[in-house]
């Protein structure tokens, strides 16, 4: 086994040894000279200081602070202090006032007589002319008594509705404001005016004129979110909860009262055991959603900020992640057939009399008569049925028809009289022919207007023009 060496203890300093061994006399030979300053170096400095004065420079084994007085600048004169005394104010002369003196001091001095001065000398002589003065010796006295002060009187009225009886209220008069009466003088004469024509500022142009005082050159567009740069990680989310409840993918908290259309901020990232979806690990902030179009699809996007690490200074570092989910593809535009909302007007008045039937151009109609009898029994006619075969492109359809019968014309009422005399005579009931319309005639022609109708209108029902025949109802 390897023996462990004892840890080496630090030796005491010379100052610590000097405190304990000086009294006992057991100090090493190099401790006492070092502490007391009697080494060879200290002695050389002491001997050299006897011939060279180095005082005040701090050269030696001292602390180097320049001695007690410190360092002084070289070749400088000490500054002198100038004593500036403040002059004393002159004393105020106090004049004593006796009990008999008035206590009111007039601001204006008493008026005095103004001397007119010396008289004008008179010169007399033979030569020249004589000057005679008309001046008087009466002195002029000026009355400088101060005029009386002007007194300005103003009145102000304050109306308080709380202390004013409603029946005493008066309508305020014109020109009265806060108790001061204002008097205005109407202007006299007529004043002319100048008619200034109005100018039109908006004039028709080419459409390229600027609409502001400082037009912005070019087209300014709002920059969209930079979601597909190299610094943003792209993550596709397939969970439908990302559209309605994105918070449920990052935490198990209750999102009932949390708005999902705004930025979601977490105080701190959740641990991996608390995140339902691993793609949303270390998410600190999830920005508001945005709808964009990408390669023919509608895309729902959110940008998230992760907090992967934190420095000692407290700054967080993390990547930006773009979470997206494609909603639906954008299909091509469908062509919608436009239909008129107003029905077209009729071409003519006779179009409203026709009914729409099958196209006679595409059908072959053949009539087969099984027989015809005009037997009358007690005033009633026996009608034999006819059949019609309609051949169309969809198949043969048999339609039953009723052939017309000949109705004999008789004068008088519709009562059949017996051929032989029979008594008593019992009249028969009238012939019942109200079920069908019978047309009896040898030939007929179409209405002349039908020859001018176009082909597409021939499918309508047209009226008949009888050449020779009768109609019985």
From Swiss-Prot:
Superkingdom: Viruses
Principal place of residence: virion
GO molecular function: DNA binding; structural molecule activity
Self-association and partners: Interacts with major capsid protein L1. Interacts with E2; this interaction inhibits E2 transcriptional activity but not the DNA replication function E2. Interacts with host GADD45GIP1. Interacts with host HSPA8; this interaction is required for L2 nuclear translocation. Interacts with host importins KPNB2 and KPNB3. Forms a complex with importin alpha2-beta1 heterodimers via interaction with the importin alpha2 adapter. Interacts with host DYNLT1; this interaction is essential for virus intracellular transport during entry.
Localization, UniProt: Virion; Host nucleus; Host early endosome; Host Golgi apparatus
Motif (Nuclear localization signal): 1-12, 452-462
Name used for this protein in its record: Minor capsid protein L2
Entry keyword set: Capsid protein, Cytoplasmic inwards viral transport, Disulfide bond, DNA-binding, Host endosome, Host Golgi apparatus, Host nucleus, Host-virus interaction, Late protein, Microtubular inwards viral transport, Phosphoprotein, Viral penetration into host nucleus, Virion, Virus entry into host cell
GO annotation, biological process: microtubule-dependent intracellular transport of viral material towards nucleus; symbiont entry into host cell; viral penetration into host nucleus
Organism: Human papillomavirus 3
Record note on modification: Highly phosphorylated.
Organism ancestry: Viruses, Monodnaviria, Shotokuvirae, Cossaviricota, Papovaviricetes
Keyword Aminoacyl-tRNA synthetase: no
Function: Minor protein of the capsid that localizes along the inner surface of the virion, within the central cavities beneath the L1 pentamers. Plays a role in capsid stabilization through interaction with the major capsid protein L1. Once the virion enters the host cell, L2 escorts the genomic DNA into the nucleus by promoting escape from the endosomal compartments and traffic through the host Golgi network.
């Amino acid at each position: 086994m390897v023996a462990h060496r004892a840890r080496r203890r630090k030796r005491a300093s010379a100052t610590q040894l000097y405190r304990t061994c000086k009294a006992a006399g057991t100090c090493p030979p190099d401790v006492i000279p070092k502490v007391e300053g009697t080494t060879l170096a200290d002695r050389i400095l002491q001997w050299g200081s006897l011939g060279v004065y180095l005082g005040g420079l701090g050269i030696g084994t001292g602390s180097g602070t320049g001695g007690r007085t410190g360092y002084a600048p070289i070749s400088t004169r000490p500054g002198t202090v100038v004593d500036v005394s403040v002059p004393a104010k002159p004393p105020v002369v106090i004049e004593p006032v006796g009990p008999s003196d008035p206590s009111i001091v007039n601001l204006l001095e008493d008026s005095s007589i103004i001397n007119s001065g010396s008289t004008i000398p008179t010169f007399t002589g033979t030569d020249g002319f004589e000057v005679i003065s008309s001046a008087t010796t009466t002195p002029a006295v000026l009355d400088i008594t101060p005029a009386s002060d002007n007194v300005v009187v103003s009145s102000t009225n304050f109306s308080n509705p709380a202390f004013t009886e409603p029946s005493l209220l008066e309508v305020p008069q014109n020109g009265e404001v806060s108790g001061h009466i204002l008097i205005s003088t109407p202007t006299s004469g007529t004043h002319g005016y100048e008619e200034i024509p109005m100018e039109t500022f908006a004039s028709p142009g080419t459409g390229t004129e600027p609409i502001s005082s400082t037009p912005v050159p070019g087209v300014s567009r709002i920059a969209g979110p930079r979601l597909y740069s190299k610094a943003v990680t792209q993550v596709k989310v397939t969970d439908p909860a990302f559209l309605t409840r994105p918070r449920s993918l990052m935490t198990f908290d209750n999102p009932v009262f949390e708005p999902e259309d705004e930025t979601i901020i977490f105080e701190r990232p959740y641990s991996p055991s608390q995140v339902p979806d691993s793609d949303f690990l270390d998410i600190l902030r999830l920005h508001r959603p945005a709808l964009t179009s990408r390669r023919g699809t509608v895309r729902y996007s959110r940008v998230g900020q992760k907090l992967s690490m934190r420095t000692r200074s407290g700054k967080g570092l993390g990547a930006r992640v773009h979470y997206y989910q494609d909603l639906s593809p954008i299909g091509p535009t469908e062509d919608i057939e436009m239909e008129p909302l107003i029905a077209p007007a009729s071409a003519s008045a006779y179009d409203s009399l026709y009914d729409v039937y099958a196209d006679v151009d595409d059908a072959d109609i053949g009539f087969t008569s099984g027989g015809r009898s005009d037997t009358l029994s007690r005033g009633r006619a026996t009608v034999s049925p006819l059949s019609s075969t309609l051949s169309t492109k969809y198949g043969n359809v048999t339609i039953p028809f009723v052939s017309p019968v000949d109705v004999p014309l008789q004068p008088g009422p519709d009562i059949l009289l017996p051929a032989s005399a029979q008594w008593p005579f019992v009249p028969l009931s009238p012939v019942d022919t109200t079920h069908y319309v019978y047309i009896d005639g040898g030939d007929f022609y179409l209405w002349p207007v039908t020859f001018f109708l176009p082909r597409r209108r021939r499918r309508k029902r047209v009226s008949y023009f009888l050449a020779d025949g009768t109609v019985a109802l």
